Amino acid sequence: MSKVLFIVGSLRQGSFNHQLAAQAEKALAGKAEVSYLDYKDVPFFNQDLESPAPAAVAKLREEILAADAIWIFSPVYNWAIPGVVKNLLDWTSRALDLSDPSGPSALKAKVGTVSSVANGTSPDEVFKHYRSLLPFIRMNVVDQFTGVGINPEAWGTGQLVLSEDKLAELSAQADALLAAIN
């Protein structure tokens, strides 16, 4: 069974993007093994710390290397990628052997996709950033992204409610991700 690693770009307890990831996990049930990356202890990227890599970074790299695919669930912060996700991608896109900068990284040739819950109607702005960044760091992107706007009521209830259309879109994205692995 394929292994899909979820990266939730919001560290907030009960985040809407974590709720979206839970729905995606249901879409992958019986088709893939899902795990969630815990990266809250990763330090800010700093070349002075790069070699040897901090233990938290080494652990991240191992988890990413063990996965067949990466699925990022990203909020939109100021129309861009959240800093914690960018930091994670900076660490894990670096060559594993620093004497060979174009050599393999934890993310090189890794299949990946992105979904996002954003305030307002659409996370298109953050998708532009991912569509530029992920190929640059040599990932194989499944460009069938799912975007969900937060309903104003969700801020009061804390609950993300997806329409049948959005659930179908998420399921189709899951199938496309699995097809890209195999």
Question: What residue spans do the PLM features occupy?
Answer:
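N-terminal beta-loop-helix "entrance" segment that forms/cooperates
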Residues: 39-55, 154-159
